């Protein structure tokens, strides 16, 4: 590929960097955003601190214990347990809503905010089922709001280097991608001592009904909260939902993977107890995209041996914590960890040989200070549309959720993206669009 062709492709890839249409201020105008945060413990604490650099006007959490640090740090900020009440009472005072709740309430919180014209940030995965992620994408356009999903790695310089190297033809055609994680592991994924788990008294700091929200209500158990919900299909999306939006991000973006046509699974134990497998291998098949060849992407969880790249240092193990590599016709592109902190060409000796060539490749625009700040800049009109806006993050999350369906059922599936159906398995329709409790329905008007 010559420089002119690469520059043209880079400009096309950079089209997402145009200023958004729905900002609240003119470029350069000094304005602080009125931000409400839903879910202020855990990752929500990070969201609260980011919001405090703007105008933190409201905090919402169903658990006073989990929220205690944020409530203590910002005692004068309005507090709520129900985000619907918060939006009804303070809607006129809120510009944007940052959501860091468990997976099963992402959709309802985001839709309630967008219906009122609020810009939204949602932690990964974007939602709990495929109908929800597609509806969120529709809603972002319908309500003309600026959106962002919290996969931090999408803002990293390493993410841009991967995209640049792929577009420049350094790696060559890629037909195989290998990804892996050391999860499921404690404290997030801990099988209960019995199924169903032992119930107990609801802590007086927790509104258990509100915590469950849109899904079928069950007796309280400490095997669900505060962090173990990730392992239960009613509430979480397993290791894939936890890490997939991070580790799939680079190949999904750089290779333009789009929607898979099939997903296969090998799991350690049979399905049926409502809890995730404690290890699996998921294989995605993607069709050719224009001149790009078909791609097989494999996801390895804890307990499965990950194959080493063809081009790798002898006697060196892959890092156990996680990583990703793409096998190209020319080179192997690799990064360790769940996110692309320091991508490289392997083996290391080859990377050193290529460095002088790689530094000459034109650079994509950088993103500073993480995904929430990127979202704030777009809202203010001081920066482009966020890179993980719902047009991008909804299809990425859909890929993750298809793998979760295969894990959950133990079935290999063929996916009809256009019809939003798993071929020949109508019994799985209820996992594509899950039942919702009365009073928690959103988005039906967008279909």
Feature locations, PLM:
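Short, solvent-exposed turn/loop segments enriched in Gly/Ser/Thr/Pro and often Arg
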Residues: 63, 100-105, 126-128, 133, ...
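N-terminal Rossmann-like dinucleotide-binding module
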Residues: 12-74, 153-156, 166, 251
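N-terminal secretory signal peptides and thylakoid transit peptides that target proteins
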Residues: 1-14
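Loop/turn elements at helix/coil->beta-strand transitions in domains of secreted/extracellular proteins
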Residues: 31-33, 54-57, 75-76, 92-96, ...
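A contiguous active-site-proximal alpha/beta segment in oxidoreductase catalytic domains
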Residues: 119, 127-205
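Contiguous beta-strand/loop segments that form the cofactor/metal-binding neighborhood of enzyme cores
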Residues: 161, 173, 178-184, 188-391, ...
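Beta-loop-alpha module in the N-terminal Rossmann-like domain of NAD(P)-dependent dehydrogenases
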Residues: 77-135
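Hydrophobic residues in well-ordered beta-strands that form the structural core
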Residues: 37, 99, 122, 128, ...
């Amino acid at each position: 590929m010559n420089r002119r062709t690469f520059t043209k492709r880079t400009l096309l890839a950079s089209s997402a960097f145009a200023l958004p249409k729905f900002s609240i201020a003119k470029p350069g105008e000094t304005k602080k955003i009125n931000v409400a945060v839903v879910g202020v413990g855990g990752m929500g604490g990070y969201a609260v601190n980011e919001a405090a650099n703007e105008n933190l006007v409201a905090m919402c959490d169903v658990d006073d214990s989990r929220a205690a640090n944020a409530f203590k740090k910002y005692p004068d900020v309005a507090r709520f347990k129900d985000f619907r009440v918060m939006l009804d009472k303070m809607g006129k005072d809120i510009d944007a809503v940052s959501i860091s709740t468990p997976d099963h309430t992402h959709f309802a919180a985001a839709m309630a905010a967008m219906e009122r014209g609020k810009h939204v940030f949602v932690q990964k995965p974007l939602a709990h089922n495929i109908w929800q992620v597609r509806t969120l994408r529709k809603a972002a356009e319908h309500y003309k709001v600026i959106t962002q999903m919290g996969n931090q790695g999408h803002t990293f310089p390493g993410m841009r280097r991967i995209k640049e190297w792929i577009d420049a033809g350094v790696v060559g055609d890629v037909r195989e991608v290998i990804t892996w994680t050391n999860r499921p592991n404690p404290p997030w994924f801990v099988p209960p001592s019995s199924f169903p788990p032992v119930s107990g008294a609801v802590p007086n700091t927790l509104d258990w009904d509100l915590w469950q929200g849109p899904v079928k209500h069950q007796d309280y158990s400490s095997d669900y909260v505060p962090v173990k919900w990730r392992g239960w299909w009613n509430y979480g999306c397993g290791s894939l939902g936890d890490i997939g939006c991070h580790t799939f991000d680079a190949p999904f973006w750089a290779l333009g993977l789009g929607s898979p046509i099939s997903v296969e699974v090998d799991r350690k134990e049979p399905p049926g107890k409502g809890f995730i497998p404690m290890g699996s291998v998921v294989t995605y098949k993607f069709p050719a995209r224009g001149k790009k060849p078909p791609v097989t992407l494999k996801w390895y969880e804890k307990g499965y041996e990950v194959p080493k790249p063809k081009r790798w240092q002898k006697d060196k193990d892959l890092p156990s914590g996680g990583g990703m590599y793409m096998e190209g016709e020319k080179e192997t592109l690799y990064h360790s960890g769940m996110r692309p902190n320091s991508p490289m060409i392997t083996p290391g000796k080859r990377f050193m040989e290529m460095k002088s060539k790689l530094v000459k490749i034109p650079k994509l625009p950088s993103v500073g200070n993480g995904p929430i700040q990127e979202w704030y800049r777009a809202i203010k009109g001081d920066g482009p549309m966020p890179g993980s806006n719902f047009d991008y993050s909804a299809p990425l999350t859909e890929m993750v959720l298809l793998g979760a369906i295969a894990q959950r059922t133990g079935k290999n599936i063929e996916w009809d993206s256009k019809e939003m159906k798993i071929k020949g398995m109508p019994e799985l329709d209820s996992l594509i669009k899950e039942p919702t409790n009365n009073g928690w329905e959103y988005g039906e008007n967008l279909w």
